[in-house]
Amino acid sequence: MPYQAESMTSQPQMTVTSYTVSHWSSDVCDCCDDCGIRLCGAFIPCILGCKVAQDNGDSCCLPFLPGAMVALRTSIRDRYHINGSVCDDWVIMTCCSFCGLCQLAREQKARG
């Protein structure tokens, strides 16, 4: 008995996933909002970077790779559906990495 493939009688439908775009819970320059995060970011930023990466489900070695903090910020922005672009992420993590890292840590803390 030869194999007969089932024929399709209708086209697959496109599914649209909608979500609400949100905003950062704190501004980039709000470093004084959380004293613990600010001190950790100022004196041991590598530890804060590792914590942010691990809380995002990434390797703790991620912050030590060139350009990885931009990707980490983009990943967190995508996870929480925060409005912005990769260019915004690059500018913040390149020009003001301390403030950007502290903002990421505050965002994770605020969203649990």
UniProtKB/Swiss-Prot annotation:
Transmembrane segments: none
Gene Ontology, cellular component aspect: cornified envelope
Protein family: Belongs to the cornifelin family.
Gene: cnfn
PANTHER family registered for this protein in UniProt: DUF614 FAMILY PROTEIN-RELATED (PTHR15907)
Domain of life of the organism encoding this protein: Eukaryota
Name assigned to this protein: Cornifelin homolog
